[in-house]
Amino acid sequence: MASSRAQRFNPIAFTPWPVTCITTIVYLALLIPILVINLVVPSAPETNPKGVNLTEAWRDLQHLTGGFHPYNSRRNDEVHEWLLSRINSIIRPTVEAGQRSSATDNLPEVFVFDDNRSNLTYSNGGVGKTSIVGVYFESTNIIVYIRGSEDDSENWRERSNGKPKGKGGVLVNAHYDSVSTGYGATDDGIGVVSLLQLLRYFTTPGNNPRKGLVLLFNNGEEDYLNGAHVFSQHPLSNFTHTFLNLEDTEVTRFYGNTKHPFGSVLAADGFKMGLLRSQTDYVVFNGILGLRGLDLAFIAPRSRYHTDQDDTRHTSIDSLWHMLSASIGTTEGLVSYTGMDFDGKSKGQNKVNSGAGSLGVWFDMFGTAFAVFRLHTLFAISVALLVIAPLVIFITSVILSKTDRMYLFSMSKSLEGTGDQVSLRGLRGFSRTPIILVIATTIPICLAYLLEKVNPYIVHSSQFSVWSMMFSAWIFLAWFLACAADFFRPSALHRAYSYTWIFVATWIMLVINTVYANQKGIAAGYFLLFYFAGAFLATWISYLELFALPRKGDFARQTTGRRPSSLSSRLLTSSADELRSNASPSTAEFPGAAGEDTDPTESTSLLRGQRTTFANYRTSGPGGAAEETDEREDINKGGTFEHEQSWSWTLPRWTWVLQLLLLAPIVLILVGQLALFLTASMCQVGSDGVSTFVVYLACAVFTTLLCIPLFPLIHRFTYHIPTFLFLVFIGTLIYNLVAFPFSPANRLKTFFIQEVDLDNGSSTVSLTGIQPYLTEAINSIPSAAGQNITCDKTTPFGMLERCSWSGLSPNVLGQGRERDTEIVPDKWITYNITKTVGKNKARIEISGRNTRACKLKFDRAVANFQVSGSAVDHRMPPTSRQGPGVIPALDEVRLYAPSWIAISKAADGLVEASHSFTIQ
């Protein structure tokens, strides 16, 4: 007996063990590499590539991040001088080679501009809820121009309003200022040292650029993107047509040249829809100047962004190489391109003629390949598939009906001649899919709501615990309900109906996504096209399987000819008339005892046709159990699984593997990477005042999208994996509800500001953050002990609170070891106000000590203003930002705050002194 069963064993049959093992292997084989790609940075090469020196780049990064260097600091000036020195040391061999033999053209010409002449007055609305402000800024940018072999040889840069001839150049940008609370390793130290290595690379023999390359070391990005704004006043801003920033397909395709591409259009659409509140220089280069480009940036961990952990200890040479290699690959593609895509007429007025461009779709595949195509292509393919796929399913259904093999939606078959009805039970399993999917999807959403109410910030440090909880809950519940439905109402059509429902649902989602892509230019739902394509093919296979079934008429005649009418069999069904004539009195009184011999529907009792004794053993009707058992075993030998419809024995037993491979891999690769990308970039946004429910809801939605390919097969799973996942769910649920959400590795970010009122000499320190953790942090600060801490929610940070107390006096006036904490107006600021007689105008002269940043606030809005000697650009109208020991209050907060607290800046400066004035 055992050997007979072994011979019949099929390793890919649609039976519990093959389904459980193969499905598990497929999911693990795809999910594990996706996790590795998202969590592990590609290793740097052991030997330096030609034109690159990684050891030198790492030393440069360590020097650059040796201290905080915001724009308004002396350390910033030191960094500026150091950069000039490094640039000159790199290009010195190039200059010397040019002096030896200017005719050889072995090395390109390099020009360095220390731009301390450009200035600009403009307005900036800031980010989020910040008010509109007028800004005056003086440039300290460093600009390096590497002449391309095809560039205009004339010295147009020295002429007033000079413009180059020929094709536009390429701009690569990074800012060398940091925030006042961070060392700036990833924001943007790695970018700066990458520019230095790009300079070395393109001045190495054999790497000469065909197009001109402009390397912009801009200063002042952290406050209103000032460095990028003032670059618009330099002649080289008219020369460049492209830069590094994700926007359109023509530029993005060059990013595919890199060895380890990583990214998705989802991030760009997040900025476009306002979901991400921060901004980069992209809004200036593209939105104002009209350049087209690509952005390379770090997205995680956000808890270290703009804090003192943004240093070389918390990054690596591998991360440096990842950005540097991507920069080299993309830039090399741009400077070598000879087409005219970036030299046509621009869409906007007063912008660089960089061509119109087109919206694009892009995503990486396992960090090794990069797909790029136009949004219009996505729209066209989506529309075609939305029409063709339903048409193919419809035509296949018609052919099945014509050949009398359409068992789907068929409740019974009439016998020719007699008119008797033979039950087919083809409608069984139709409605279970949407019901179970709705319930299984509701559970993660309920869990999201539960976490938001009980422990809303657990995702800050434990995103994979949240993922595990939702995945395990979804799979276990779907398995339990599907197995229960299959036990009471087994159906060979469960898989076909499941894929049909998935087909319908993804068709609707693709329609919505196609409309958004066409009307709003949103491409983040690109994965739905591939999701729907996989669902369509899997569904079509289920319909094609039906051609292997006997004709319904043949099955009906065979059924009535094999056995007398009785109630003994659950598998072979007699007509209703025969049932009534052969039924015993006891069964005639109870219609439910007739089992499945009447026409069933999805609303019929789940216990029909399968009566149990008090010991829960199944019994049969008149005719005896022996007859039923012999008949069932005979049918099962032919291929019918347990108590499924007897006509299903001819269905192929291997096609489920093909369906799994058509749907699951593409979903896991595209949706899985999006899910991890989304949570990595958003899991810590709670500290910025964003509701974490959005993150949990996204996890719930992506959990459903990732698990749906399992559902048509999940009723065949053995109990082992679902039971294990149930235990995982219990453990992760308890952890997520009770665990402390922050840790030294995943700190809660708070925002510091100290305000000095020169009128009354008061000094107020404020921290903005999440309650109740903010109060706990403040209670650990000595100077706040015993004080009346005032808190309010009137902040530009959304859901955060701002708490204030009287803090230690700052020492921002002193230089070196000199201390000067006296709050006297004349020591901090001098000013003179002259009002124009007879006009609503005034002249204000102001000078602050030991600072080059100044802010004027008015009680009423100012119609217009002008800074003496400032340039004005009609593209940016003027109406419509120190080290330890200087600010003792900040040092105190850093010293005594819990280890799970991080400090970041709350405003343009860390200390803001105010003095009231009156214009008379």
Curated annotation (Swiss-Prot):
Alphabetical list of InterPro entries matching this protein: Fxna-like_M28_dom, M28_fam, Peptidase_M28, PFF1_C, PFF1_TM
Keyword Transmembrane helix: yes
Record's keyword terms, sorted: Glycoprotein, Hydrolase, Membrane, Metal-binding, Metalloprotease, Protease, Transmembrane, Transmembrane helix, Vacuole, Zinc
Provenance organism: Ajellomyces capsulatus (strain H143)
GO terms for cellular component: vacuolar membrane
Presence of the UniProt keyword Membrane in the record: yes
Binding site for Zn(2+) 1: 175, 187, 247
Protein name: Vacuolar membrane protease
